[in-house]
A protein has these predicted regions:
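Intrinsically disordered, low-complexity, hydrophilic segments
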Residues: 1-101
C-alpha cells in the first residue's frame, strides 16, 4: 500500500484498539485510558507500513529513538508504550495476537 494510502487504514485499526486496548497486558492495570496508548498504536501502525519487510527486532532500537520526535507523541516513555507499539506493528504485519482482526 502506498504511503498516502496506508494512513487511510488507520481509522479501522484505531477503532479496533479503542475497543480492545484494555484487554492487553500493559493496559490491564487500568492506570491509563485509551488516549494514553492511542499515539503508540498509531506509531506502530505507521511504522509497520513505513518499514515494511523489516523485522521488529531489527528496527526496535530505531523506533525507540524516533519515538522522542514522533509528531503525535505524548509525554509517555518508550518503555511505557513499547507493548502498544509492538501490538500495532504485529497487527499490521500479520503477527497478531490470537483473536485479532
Amino acid at each position: 500500500m502506498a504511503e498516502k494510502d496506508y494512513r487511510l487504514g488507520w481509522t479501522e485499526d484505531e477503532e479496533y484498539w479503542r475497543t480492545n486496548y484494555s484487554s492487553r497486558p500493559y493496559a490491564s492495570t487500568g492506570k491509563q485510558d485509551y488516549t494514553f496508548y492511542q499515539p503508540a498504536y498509531r506509531y506502530g501502525f505507521e511504522s509497520a507500513h513505513r518499514y515494511e519487510g523489516r523485522n521488529w527486532n531489527d528496527i526496535e532500537s530505531q523506533l525507540s529513538r524516533d519515538w522522542t520526535t514522533y509528531e503525535h507523541r505524548t509525554k509517555s516513555t518508550w518503555e511505557e508504550i513499547k507493548g502498544a507499539v509492538r501490538d500495532a506493528w504485529d497487527r499490521v504485519t500479520g503477527k497478531r495476537p490470537v483473536g485479532t482482526r
